[in-house]
């Protein structure tokens, strides 16, 4: 599911840009 995929990206430091792309406010911290 998309949700589990997003959770996997949270646990994977190799994809910080994907996290920022999904959560722009997350990248501002």
UniProtKB/Swiss-Prot annotation:
Its EC number is 2.5.1.47. The keyword Iron does not apply. It is found in: Cytoplasm. Pathway: Amino-acid biosynthesis; L-cysteine biosynthesis; L-cysteine from L-serine: step 2/2. GO terms for cellular component: cytoplasm. It comes from the Eukaryota. Keywords: Amino-acid biosynthesis, Cysteine biosynthesis, Cytoplasm, Pyridoxal phosphate, Transferase. GO terms for molecular function: cysteine synthase activity. Coiled coil: none annotated. Its cofactor is pyridoxal 5'-phosphate. It catalyses: O-acetyl-L-serine + hydrogen sulfide = L-cysteine + acetate. Homodimer. Belongs to the cysteine synthase/cystathionine beta-synthase family. This is Cysteine synthase. It comes from Populus euphratica.
């Amino acid at each position: 599911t998309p949700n589990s995929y997003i959770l996997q990206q949270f646990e994977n430091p190799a994809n910080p840009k994907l996290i920022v792309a999904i959560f722009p406010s997350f990248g501002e911290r």
